[in-house]
Regions:
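Extracytoplasmic low-complexity repetitive segments enriched in small/polar residues
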Residues: 43-44, 58-62, 86, 99-101, ...
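Short acidic-glycine-tyrosine-enriched beta hairpin
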Residues: 60, 90-107
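Extracellular/periplasmic catalytic domains that process cell-envelope and extracellular macromolecules
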Residues: 48, 71-72, 79, 115-119
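Histidine-centered metal-chelating micro-motifs
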Residues: 65-67, 86, 101-113
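Glycine- and acidic-residue-biased ligand/ion/polar-headgroup-sensing regions
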Residues: 71-90
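Short coil/loop residues immediately preceding or within conserved phosphate-binding loops
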Residues: 55, 75, 107
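A short, N-terminal "cap"/entry segment at the start of jelly-roll beta-barrel domains
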Residues: 2-54, 95, 102-103
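Ligand-binding loop in jelly-roll beta-barrel domains
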Residues: 107-131
Length: 131
């Protein structure tokens, strides 16, 4: 496991106890995202200058999906808080339910959808370039 991914996993656990900051990003119809917290990684780890670790809560309403996207330069850890989400990678679709998690690394191209009758609520931690 590389240092960047390990740092993301360790920081994600530590950040869960931090107070929630609110910010809403533009998202597709039926999906809402609330930024929970972020930290400038350069102040924590020398080798990740210009990047932050961001934790968000994303909700997919029933029938909602996002578009296919890449995780090149932005690794991500996803935890399903409630409901079910289907993660599509190429021809493979995998359903994740409450209490399950998955990752998206530099070679990941995927999209997600909620085919269920209840909202799917995800906690998403991503390392991104500082804006």
């Amino acid at each position: 496991m590389n240092a960047l991914r390990m740092s993301a996993i360790l920081c994600t656990g530590a950040l869960a106890a931090v107070a929630i900051a609110t910010a809403t990003a533009q998202t597709p119809r039926g999906q809402s995202t609330k930024q929970l917290v972020s930290v400038d990684l350069a102040s924590e780890i020398d080798s990740v200058q210009g990047r932050i670790l961001r934790m968000q809560m994303t909700t997919y309403d029933p029938g909602a999906s996002n578009t296919a996207h890449s995780h090149k330069d932005r690794p991500e850890v996803v935890y399903v808080l409630s409901g079910k989400i289907i993660d599509h990678r190429g021809d493979v679709a995998k359903e994740y339910g409450a209490g399950e998690s998955f990752t998206a690394g530099k070679d990941t191209m995927h999209w997600m959808e909620n085919q269920g009758g209840l909202p799917a609520v995800l906690i998403v931690s991503t390392i991104v370039k500082k804006e």
